[in-house]
């Protein structure tokens, strides 16, 4: 009878550890997916840094400038 309780206790402990590990793994995967989703470009009406642009029709975001010398959106320092 004692052996049966020990086996049942070990089985219960195994199930508890397994569920705990699955919870931890799923929360870790959620954190990783949110972290990498932040790197994905978002849709916006203006062009971000290093985006190719036309000086005549600059669609760069505020604080970025597009010039003839540098036909890409770059940070506009001091203005």
From Swiss-Prot:
<feature type="signal peptide">
    <location>
        <begin position="1"/>
        <end position="19"/>
    </location>
</feature>
<feature type="modified residue" description="Alanine amide">
    <location>
        <position position="77"/>
    </location>
</feature>
<keyword id="KW-1015">Disulfide bond</keyword>
<feature type="disulfide bond">
    <location>
        <begin position="60"/>
        <end position="73"/>
    </location>
</feature>
<keyword id="KW-0027">Amidation</keyword>
<protein>
    <recommendedName>
        <fullName>Orally active insecticidal peptide</fullName>
    </recommendedName>
</protein>
<comment type="function">
    <text>Probable ion channel inhibitor. Shows insecticidal activity when injected into mealworms.</text>
</comment>
<keyword id="KW-0964">Secreted</keyword>
<feature type="propeptide">
    <location>
        <begin position="20"/>
        <end position="44"/>
    </location>
</feature>
<dbReference type="InterPro" id="IPR004214">
    <property type="entry name" value="Conotoxin"/>
</dbReference>
<feature type="disulfide bond">
    <location>
        <begin position="53"/>
        <end position="66"/>
    </location>
</feature>
<keyword id="KW-0960">Knottin</keyword>
<dbReference type="GO" id="GO:0090729">
    <property type="term" value="F:toxin activity"/>
</dbReference>
<feature type="disulfide bond">
    <location>
        <begin position="46"/>
        <end position="61"/>
    </location>
</feature>
<keyword id="KW-0732">Signal</keyword>
<keyword id="KW-0872">Ion channel impairing toxin</keyword>
<keyword id="KW-0800">Toxin</keyword>
<dbReference type="GO" id="GO:0008200">
    <property type="term" value="F:ion channel inhibitor activity"/>
</dbReference>
<comment type="similarity">
    <text>Belongs to the neurotoxin 03 (Tx2) family. 01 subfamily.</text>
</comment>
<dbReference type="GO" id="GO:0005576">
    <property type="term" value="C:extracellular region"/>
</dbReference>
<dbReference type="Pfam" id="PF02950">
    <property type="entry name" value="Conotoxin"/>
</dbReference>
